[in-house]
Amino acid sequence: MARLNFAALIVIMITAGCVSDVPQMASDGKPVPKPYFLSQVEPAIIQFRMLDGVNALRQSRDADVVNLNASLTAAAATHARDMSVQDRPWHFGSDASSPIDRLVRVGYSGQLVGEVISETYETELETLAAWMTDEGARRIILDAKADELGLAWHQEADGKIWWAMVLGASRTPQVRITE
């Protein structure tokens, strides 16, 4: 009996080593993405990765850097969760709120520069790269008026991530008069 158990153990060990790591393919012929679970990463790390990425892109275009803003992040968090509830990536809340409405609700005293959103399984930097390929999103991210940023997300159990990034301008534009 011991020989049989030992033989079974050997067979199991050998076949376990034969498991192929061939990626599962989607209907479009591309590998099915492996979910990136944000719960395994500290939220501040994700926010600072995105902030660093945004600022590197802005500096490469001679735009000033932006800083994280808690009010903008609160507005982004509300919208990321709401997009998930609606199962729809768009700029209006389930209560018909606009990005401006959400900034008013969180008490942001600056001006909205823009909001960029995404429904994806991608990391924060992959999402930023995708946003940079979209003319409208790129224009918001690089807008020289922006000096503050809020970033938030909501992740579903299957790994789908709803990203929302809001850029704002806290400073009053300077008017220069020359003679």
Where are these regions (language model features)?
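Well-structured core secondary-structure elements of compact alpha/beta domains
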Residues: 31-35, 40, 44, 48, ...
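Intrinsically disordered, low-complexity segments enriched in small/polar and acidic residues
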Residues: 26, 39, 175-176
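Short, surface-exposed glycine/acidic/tryptophan-bearing loops
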Residues: 21, 26-28, 73-122
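Bacterial Sec signal peptide processing site at the extreme N-terminus
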Residues: 12-36
